[in-house]
Amino acid sequence: MNHIQDAFLNTLKVERNFSEHTLKSYQDDLIQFNQFLEQEHLELNTFEYRDARNYLSYLYSNHLKRTSVSRKISTLRTFYEYWMTLDENIINPFVQLVHPKKEKYLPQFFYEEEMEALFKTVEEDTSKNLRDRVILELLYATGIRVSELVNIKKQDIDFYANGVTVLGKGSKERFVPFGAYCRQSIENYLEHFKPIQSCNHDFLIVNMKGEAITERGVRYVLNDIVKRTAGVSEIHPHKLRHTFATHLLNQGADLRTVQSLLGHVNLSTTGKYTHVSNQQLRKVYLNAHPRAKKENET
């Protein structure tokens, strides 16, 4: 990494409020790019469009998914755009490079019975479960990102309005309501979880030492809950966000409301959940409509 790349990453962190997970992805993309430069005896400031095309081929030769390749190219395009603001002699070699089309996929989510099983795992009021349950409740009840969760302060919780104020992408604040189960888990956590009572900061979610929990720490907690839950496998923080959106739409929430709750700028981003919701609608239709199936069909 050189000083320009370090400055670029610092700008993303300070001015654009990128999460540590996203910053790590950008850093990894730059490191891989630097390795390619060294391997091909190329220089960062003389890198050309034809070199960019060769780099695209190099990425595909490593059997990466199109989504991964697209992200890596986007990282480098953004980096050169930043560099151009500092040096008028720099040309962005990635600006004309066509993004590989992203693979279409349906968001993964948990069924309601799977969520019930996860909550049952952290039902007993042990010290660890008090903290783990509040993480699970907040992520499922509000659909917030993990980067938003770890930055919640105690004063961001509004027990009168039953909701939480979070700082989303682009440093945009939004208020997200939560229900009775989530409220109760927060109250129990604040009252009985000893590490939160003795810490000298205002962060809501802490580890067993009373330190503000990290995104990595949240992922560890969620993986541990899954390991202790029979019949549930594979979890990532965004899966709970997908579950939140899917369950709301399945119960009749309109797309604009879900967009606002998730903090999406574009409605099209929220729209991907309607495909999942439509599957649920078809399932209900097939089970309920008297002429949905022929007699010999199951």
UniProtKB/Swiss-Prot annotation:
Active site: 145, 169, 238, 241, 264, 273 (o-(3'-phospho-dna)-tyrosine intermediate)
Domain Tyr recombinase: 105-286
Molecular-function annotations in GO: DNA binding; site-specific recombinase activity; tyrosine-based site-specific recombinase activity
Domain of life of the source: Bacteria
GO terms, biological process: cell division; chromosome segregation; DNA recombination; DNA transposition
UniProt domain Core-binding (CB): residue ranges: 1-84
Segments traversing the membrane: none
Subcellular locations according to the entry: Cytoplasm
One GO location term (cellular component): cytoplasm
Matching InterPro entries: CB (IPR044068), DNA_brk_join_enz (IPR011010), Integrase-like_cat_sf (IPR013762), Integrase_catalytic (IPR002104), Integrase_recombinase_N (IPR010998), Integrase_SAM-like_N (IPR004107), Recomb_XerC (IPR011931), Tyrosine_recombinase_XerC/XerD (IPR023009)
Keywords tagged on the record: Cell cycle, Cell division, Chromosome partition, Cytoplasm, DNA integration, DNA recombination, DNA-binding
Job description of the protein: Site-specific tyrosine recombinase, which acts by catalyzing the cutting and rejoining of the recombining DNA molecules. The XerC-XerD complex is essential to convert dimers of the bacterial chromosome into monomers to permit their segregation at cell division. It also contributes to the segregational stability of plasmids.
Family: Belongs to the 'phage' integrase family. XerC subfamily.
Subunit annotation: Forms a cyclic heterotetrameric complex composed of two molecules of XerC and two molecules of XerD.
Protein name (Swiss-Prot/TrEMBL): Tyrosine recombinase XerC
Species name: Staphylococcus aureus (strain NCTC 8325 / PS 47)
